[in-house]
């Protein structure tokens, strides 16, 4: 058992990922060729629709502001019940001329039962609120736009990376050239943190060992 304990420590220590500090290089979002239907008008530019207001994003490369307000509340529960029981009885009826009354007391019997019950519950909740500046990377023939925003922050070895993309209608952009996340279709949000603060929230190596030895 002692050898198994040290073997698990060695395996877990070898599996620990050591992060190397890499120089971050910004990559511009990929842009697509605009595909717009021909409008039979002298004012073909979409900006002409807002002659008395502020300029709103409408073409590839335009900047748009995205206000993210998302709440997460997930609850998952699992329960299992397993049971089994067996019983048997047998009596010896004849054995080399021994009297039947004597053999009746030589019967064999047994009973066994097994029951197992387990359950688990997972709950996660959180609120994500931020404002990002993104770009229009594609304009579809119906006027909707594919927008993408990314933000990368590194302070004292703690890294935060945020990526958002989705489809926006021009009508949902307000006069401040801002759209809220609840009006973005097919929205994808990627948020990841790396560093010693993030690792501090992870279980330690000893807790991982006990989780392997006692999974239930």
Curated annotation (Swiss-Prot):
Organism: Aquifex aeolicus (strain VF5)
Cellular component per GO, a single term: bacterial-type flagellum basal body, distal rod, L ring
Stated role: Assembles around the rod to form the L-ring and probably protects the motor/basal body from shearing forces during rotation.
Subcellular location: Cell outer membrane; Bacterial flagellum basal body
GO molecular function terms attached to this record: cytoskeletal motor activity
Assembly notes: The basal body constitutes a major portion of the flagellar organelle and consists of four rings (L,P,S, and M) mounted on a central rod.
Lipidation (S-diacylglycerol cysteine): 14
Biological process annotations from GO: bacterial-type flagellum-dependent cell motility
Signal peptide segment: 1-13
Name of the protein in its database record: Flagellar L-ring protein
Keyword vocabulary terms for this entry: Bacterial flagellum, Cell outer membrane, Lipoprotein, Membrane, Palmitate, Signal
Family: Belongs to the FlgH family.
Lipidation (N-palmitoyl cysteine): 14
Superkingdom assignment: Bacteria
Topology term for the membrane: Lipid-anchor
Pfam families named among the record's database cross-references: FlgH
